[in-house]
Amino acid sequence: MSDTHLSTQKFADFPLHKEVHQALNEAGFEFCTPIQALSLPILLEKKDIAGQAQTGTGKTLAFLVATFNHLLSTPIPAERQLNQPRAIIMAPTRELAIQIAKDANLLAKHTGLKVGIVYGGEGYEVQRKVLDKGVDILIGTTGRIIDYVRQGVINVSCIQAVVLDEADRMFDLGFIKDIRFLFRRMPDAKSRLNMLFSATLSMKVQELAYDHMNEPEKVEIAPNEKTSKNIKEEIFYPSMEEKMPLLLSLLEEDWPEKAIVFSNTKHSCEKVWSWLEGDGHRAGLLTGDVPQKKRLRILEQFTKGEIDILVATDVAARGLHIADVSHVYNYDLPDDCEDYVHRIGRTGRAGQKGISVSFACEEYALNLPAIESYIQHSIPVTSYDSDALLDDIPPPVRIHRKPSTHTRNTRDRGASRPQGGQRSGPRRHDRTRRHS
């Protein structure tokens, strides 16, 4: 991991509880990222914050350190039942909740504090048994948390710390009523430490903060830069007929180690996945129709490198936090400007470099002016040579038929594999991009 995203502020300089310091040291955290350096001094004074920061900036560790330190240094309410949570961390998606829980368990090692996670889609009774045994810090999605609150499994009347992560996505997914429901059942805002983080501090997000928090201080990281300088952006103008050949040619040329291809609809994602599979790429498909267990398996394969390319819709990809994504391909330009920022923010994280490639086809090119206005810069245009596009593309596989590994060639991920992978037919060696 590159250290170029770190500040000169050390965690050791903060008056943290010794068990928190020990966990940070063992995990290899020495220097703070900017959001950590700005937010922790405020939070350690037990003041609320509303932080603006993109994913990959270290905000998760910021609110986890503050939460653990707050619970370790604050007396437990006398009326609190032993198995009831003292802190709640709410996330918009189960994948984000799972990632937060993994990070929380790193800090929990020496503290004696128990971490629990709940989310919809699976394991209702299993999760309930964990809650019955008792948790100090509850991490989860709002819908499942509310289910347990309404059934009397969870009591939030003694909550001492609250985190609302990716608040803007909470609005997008329609969870704000659920959040307000939970806030109204917690102690007064002045009686707890409140933390809100969002990629954008829109008026509706700020209104939520001021309604349910105690005069939160705003903390903003590079508020004028909606996209990271670590991401190289480029855009192509393909015809509809050349859109798929261009994508396959660029994948052949770039040969990304880990890439995400975004498309606007489930049908389009299935089409892209079918062509990638037919061309021998190790691809995974994430749409709203993918069952939760299969979804988690695909994400695990992608994280481990067993899958190289993830094809996803915006809704299905929300909350994903996967390290080392080298390329993002916008097969379709998104209709929502904020989705463009969230999409390309999957790469170029934690100080690493990333590449974003977008297609402005006839159907979605009209979205470009609004996107460029929102990100406050023009996306560099790259032309391409139609004659250099791949012309030996195999047919797509059927979406409901798992391709046989014995009848198709797949990408050889070995270090000695030739550029373009091992396929039965020759590939063109022409360069697709034409730079002026």
Curated annotation (Swiss-Prot):
<feature type="short sequence motif" description="Q motif">
    <location>
        <begin position="9"/>
        <end position="37"/>
    </location>
</feature>
<dbReference type="InterPro" id="IPR014014">
    <property type="entry name" value="RNA_helicase_DEAD_Q_motif"/>
</dbReference>
<dbReference type="GO" id="GO:0005524">
    <property type="term" value="F:ATP binding"/>
</dbReference>
<feature type="domain" description="Helicase C-terminal">
    <location>
        <begin position="243"/>
        <end position="390"/>
    </location>
</feature>
<feature type="region of interest" description="Disordered">
    <location>
        <begin position="392"/>
        <end position="436"/>
    </location>
</feature>
<keyword id="KW-0547">Nucleotide-binding</keyword>
<dbReference type="Pfam" id="PF00270">
    <property type="entry name" value="DEAD"/>
</dbReference>
<dbReference type="InterPro" id="IPR050079">
    <property type="entry name" value="DEAD_box_RNA_helicase"/>
</dbReference>
<dbReference type="GO" id="GO:0005829">
    <property type="term" value="C:cytosol"/>
</dbReference>
<comment type="similarity">
    <text>Belongs to the DEAD box helicase family. RhlB subfamily.</text>
</comment>
<keyword id="KW-0067">ATP-binding</keyword>
<dbReference type="InterPro" id="IPR001650">
    <property type="entry name" value="Helicase_C-like"/>
</dbReference>
<dbReference type="GO" id="GO:0006401">
    <property type="term" value="P:RNA catabolic process"/>
</dbReference>
<keyword id="KW-0694">RNA-binding</keyword>
<comment type="subunit">
    <text>Component of the RNA degradosome, which is a multiprotein complex involved in RNA processing and mRNA degradation.</text>
</comment>
<dbReference type="Pfam" id="PF00271">
    <property type="entry name" value="Helicase_C"/>
</dbReference>
<dbReference type="InterPro" id="IPR014001">
    <property type="entry name" value="Helicase_ATP-bd"/>
</dbReference>
<dbReference type="InterPro" id="IPR000629">
    <property type="entry name" value="RNA-helicase_DEAD-box_CS"/>
</dbReference>
<dbReference type="InterPro" id="IPR027417">
    <property type="entry name" value="P-loop_NTPase"/>
</dbReference>
<dbReference type="InterPro" id="IPR023554">
    <property type="entry name" value="RNA_helicase_ATP-dep_RhlB"/>
</dbReference>
<comment type="function">
    <text>DEAD-box RNA helicase involved in RNA degradation. Has RNA-dependent ATPase activity and unwinds double-stranded RNA.</text>
</comment>
<keyword id="KW-0963">Cytoplasm</keyword>
<feature type="short sequence motif" description="DEAD box">
    <location>
        <begin position="165"/>
        <end position="168"/>
    </location>
</feature>
<feature type="domain" description="Helicase ATP-binding">
    <location>
        <begin position="40"/>
        <end position="219"/>
    </location>
</feature>
<feature type="compositionally biased region" description="Basic residues">
    <location>
        <begin position="425"/>
        <end position="436"/>
    </location>
</feature>
<protein>
    <recommendedName>
        <fullName>ATP-dependent RNA helicase RhlB</fullName>
        <ecNumber>3.6.4.13</ecNumber>
    </recommendedName>
</protein>
<dbReference type="GO" id="GO:0003724">
    <property type="term" value="F:RNA helicase activity"/>
</dbReference>
<dbReference type="InterPro" id="IPR011545">
    <property type="entry name" value="DEAD/DEAH_box_helicase_dom"/>
</dbReference>
<keyword id="KW-0347">Helicase</keyword>
<dbReference type="GO" id="GO:0003723">
    <property type="term" value="F:RNA binding"/>
</dbReference>
<dbReference type="GO" id="GO:0016887">
    <property type="term" value="F:ATP hydrolysis activity"/>
</dbReference>
<feature type="binding site">
    <location>
        <begin position="53"/>
        <end position="60"/>
    </location>
    <ligand>
        <name>ATP</name>
    </ligand>
</feature>
<keyword id="KW-0378">Hydrolase</keyword>
